[in-house]
Amino acid sequence: MLGWVVTFLVVALIAGLLGFGGIAGASIEIAKIIFFIAIVLFLVSAVISIFRGRTRV
């Protein structure tokens, strides 16, 4: 699951860079939402993995 979160985080970062850079002005709000959701999911998955003691990514 952590692998999927990292994948979506990378996609959100790319979308955020395009959105914040003014290239895709209409998608700025969507990129912001996806970016923050991906960060939250990444942090939750990382914390759960740490507490379970698994080192899989």
Swiss-Prot record:
CC terms in the record's Gene Ontology section: plasma membrane
Parts of the chain that traverse the membrane: 4-24, 30-50
Keywords of the record: Cell membrane, Membrane, Transmembrane, Transmembrane helix
Cell membrane among keywords: yes
Top-rank taxon: Bacteria
Location within or outside the cell: Cell membrane
A Pfam family annotated for this UniProt entry: DUF1328
Membrane topology, record value: Multi-pass membrane protein
Keyword check for Membrane: yes
UniProt family annotation: Belongs to the UPF0391 family.
Protein name, entry field: UPF0391 membrane protein RPA3505
Organism: Rhodopseudomonas palustris (strain ATCC BAA-98 / CGA009)
